[in-house]
A protein has these predicted regions:
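N-terminal intrinsically disordered, cationic/polar leader segments
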Residues: 2-121, 125-173
Length: 173
């Protein structure tokens, strides 16, 4: 039995049912942290005088790493490149992570929580870190638009299903 207060194994504060069984599915964020943050302001101070509206290129990626049977690290990578015809205004790259605990869940539900729900929970905090980094670099804070992680997740599942179906011989399900 986990010791009281062990956040990596004791995911719920409620004691198990009267028979001692712990069968309720549970998932949650145990810890959040900045794993890596890079800010480049390569053309300062000249870039502060540029009047042209910069073009923004925002990329994101989600990865997961299993720590143990109940805990995974979810990494949300966000890269922001701001450019004008005169050159790069700034570049911000962030790896924002969360330790996620999941217990008594099917693999399908764990996968959905890992790649849709956990990033949705982490994103507002990552967005704040990026906004603060851009502001601290001397520019107006950048407020990234919300991302529909669930919609993207469902779209990718559908694409994978279509690819699997396209590769199957006729007459097979």
């Amino acid at each position: 039995m986990a010791e009281e207060g062990d956040v990596l194994t004791n995911l719920d504060a409620d004691p198990a049912g009267g028979n001692g069984a712990d069968t309720q599915p549970i998932a949650g964020i145990l810890q959040q942290y900045v794993k890596d943050l890079s800010v480049e302001n390569p053309k300062a101070p000249e870039s502060f005088q540029w009047n042209e509206q910069p073009q923004m290129d925002v990329q994101f990626n989600i990865s997961a790493r299993k720590i143990n049977e109940e805990v995974s690290e979810i990494e949300l990578k966000i890269s922001v490149h701001s450019k004008t015809a005169q050159g790069t205004v700034y570049i911000v790259e962030l790896a924002y992570c969360g330790l996620v605990g999941m217990r008594n869940m099917t693999d399908e539900h764990k996968h959905a929580f890992t790649y849709a729900e956990a990033p949705r929970i982490l994103f507002p905090f990552a967005r704040r870190v990026i906004g603060d980094a851009v502001r601290d670099a001397g520019f107006a804070p950048l407020l990234l638009d919300p991302i529909d992680f669930n919609g993207i997740y469902l779209q990718q599942l559908q694409q994978r299903g279509e690819q699997s179906f396209a590769g199957a011989p006729a007459g097979e399900a």
